[in-house]
Amino acid sequence: MSELAIRRGAAPALAVEGLGYSYPHAAHAALEDVSLEVAPGEFVLLAGRSASGKSTLLKAACGLVPHFHGGEIEGEVRVGALDAIATGPGELAAAVGYLAQDPETQVVSTTVAAEIELPLELRGDEPGDRARAVEEVALALAIPHLLERTVDTLSGGELQRVALAAALVTRPRLILLDEPTSQLDPVAGDELIWLLRRLNEEWGVAVLLAEHRLERCLAAADRVVAMEGGRISFDGAPADFLAWAQDADPALETPAARLFSLAGIEPLPVGVRDARQTLRRPGISHPPRQASRRVRDPRPTDPASTPVLSARGIWVELDRGEDLRDVLKGIDLTIGPGERVALMGRNGAGKSTLLRTAAGLHEPVAGKLEVGSVALLTQTPGDYLVRERVGDELPGDEGLAALRVVGLEHALDADPRDLSGGERQRLAVAIALAGRMEGDQLPGLVALDEPTRGMDRARKDDLVDLIARLAGQGALVADGSTNSTHDAAVVVATHDVEFAAAFAARVVLLGDGVVIADGPAEEILSGGWYFATEVARVLDLPGVVTPEQGAAALGETR
Amino acid sequence: MKSPFAYQPRPGPLQSASPGAAVAYLGAIVAVAFLYSSPVVLVAAGVAAILAGLLAGARRAVRVALKMGLALALLIVVVNALVVSRGETVLARLGGWPLLGQVDITFEAIVAGLSGGLRAAVAMVAAAVYSACVDPDRVLRLLRPLAGRSALTATLVSRMVPVAAADAARLRDASRLRGPGAAPVGKAPLARRLLAGSLDRAVDVAATLELRGYSLDATRARNRRARSRYDRRFYAVAGIVLVAAIAGKALGADDFQTYPEVEVGLGPATLALSALVALSGLAPLKRRATRRTTADGTKTALPNRKSSRWQEMAGRRGVARV
């Protein structure tokens, strides 16, 4: 009998029975007839598109629903021996920890040590017990070196770990996580998943993790629960989930599973290791490395074309609190018309600073920057929406032209708050574009900073279409004086390698303020560990990064 | 950008001291500023506050507070000079002004304003040093048993203010990035948006507090007595400064008069008190360890940078010094 089966015999860490819930004044129920059990020590992945009910289910399991949000609830939720509907989140805190998407709003103290200690202090624990618990959880999460730091000096990944430590310090038997890696770079995201697996294996903490990037965590999960329209649509093993998603909801397929299904290989793999093992089986021939195609350099070779951005040795220094720090260190970069460029690199590498400098928000302290009109969408599209009617945000012909470009001309009278997340983002793009266009032609450079945070696959696909459409529109070139038109270049700063592989022809990889790699997307995204797609990690073939390319490469050898 | 007054953990004595000791020490300097009007003593208190900040590593906080304090001092001098016409040394007669009536600028009013301005500047620098060097979490933990809800409100404010400042900066950037064809963003819509965002964040933070167990009716947690080996030093310096200030006041060390003529006393009591107050700024000085105790209990001298340099210099000159 497996250990998991033994654990399954014990009282479940979480038991949900016939749960239905509606937020106050909501037209539709957020959850309908949800029944679910999480065994002690089990790692369960919660999959589903945006607004499918994942977050609400997690909030019900930690008591925020209905105690904090109100609304109408029916059914039963038990966390260990506690009734989560009758008991408030405070009482449940000892039995369940909760980690949300945005680490910024999950810390309330000034220093890390005080933040982690707060739940114990509020519970009335003795000072000695608190000191030990803080030390233990800091060691478990590898953050003892952060204890004396102030929370405003931490990176997103560090802050997320601190929030996790505060959620775990009471030693709950269940931890709920709502897209905890959505704001992290691939390195920090993978580290967090690895950490969860270790907590799960070594300390027996049951994990219920809601996540969009399934390829990141499917291999770590014991079980997958998929949700759709507030109901559970699938509950089973990861391999069975992939077979189910193939027919029921292809947007939930992982890239490796899609590669296998396109190539007609069974069974579908739950992770890179699994996929490689399957490919080593007799009867399946893995293409040799040299069989890969030559990758064409996407940069324009026409010397007559005027670049839309030309940076030569630019340095940018920013005030980071105590001292000025060089964030960009002599960047050389040229982007031509019509290019689709992914700007990648870990948090703090200088991606956003480069885009903000191009848009005129920062002034280089050295070097030469030549750039025409730039429309930049920052990381929070909501910041652009300040009025209650789309038409009031974008008045006149210029506004209408911008709305047409993003396909929102029908929504003139809508309230931006009533639009979907994707539509709000497109509206923000239109606001950045308005007045920078020549008729229906876009400005020279359209820049998007981390546009896929918290997005599901379907919305990312929509964004890929939008980028392709933007890159196909005419634009004013850098020396606007010539008034000649070219295609617009689109530059997207992103951590999402799969998204980069889907839209970009070229990838520029930044590391600590310098360009460390610049080349065709297929080449850059197949030549590393972290900044490589799942298909690239499975096949390890230069130039093969998407499931379609992978299936073609496998097909050549079969 | 991080506020210059934000707390920054550093390994200095002032940061290591318990909040009570740090407050007593900086409070004593501020108390001198409010007890005395003599510019000599006020300058000494200012020197003490600046020294304390610099030795504690809060250079940026001191610099910014000094700039703000001196600007405020200048404002007080100007306002006092315009509003108060007392004093015998008239420097300028500016005639009749609406609301103010006859305005005569006198040397005495300027000096009186300078005294008030210096007092404000000292208080500002001391407050900046407190803010940059004293861990607010430890202060709030100290206050929590006395006023739990107020302490928590203060915690939230101290957390939400920098978050709101970051939100405001982001919204300003977004308004600058709007295309010229989009409706311009006035201050009112921006403020509304900032308020709405802050409320959303406040709701999220409130949810976090709920999850941390804020609503629990737990018995008040006992706190460790936050002790430091520097506490006695700061309490002692605070005590000495306060006792000397009170005694000096009784002995006429605050010998300063502005009207009808300026008279600044420079008697021994004033000078001694000023020297003592200025020297109190050295309290956060970290003493270098000069001896190391080995495992067997023997004590050996530690090489320090100064003596090494001396030895190096002595060696170059061909003189052996130990």
Predicted features by range, described:
Chain A
Residues 175-178, 446-449:
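Catalytic Walker B motif of ABC-type/P-loop ATPase nucleotide-binding domains
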Residues 167-168, 433, 437-440:
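ABC ATPase C-loop
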Residues 211-212, 494-495:
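H-loop/switch region of ABC-family ATPase nucleotide-binding domains
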Residues 62, 359:
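Helix-to-loop junction immediately C-terminal to a conserved catalytic motif
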Residues 22, 65, 76-91, 362-368, ...:
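ABC ATPase NBD Q-loop/coupling interface
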Residues 128-146, 309, 314, 395, ...:
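Conserved ABC ATPase "signature" region
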Residues 243-303, 307, 531-558:
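ABC ATPase nucleotide-binding domains
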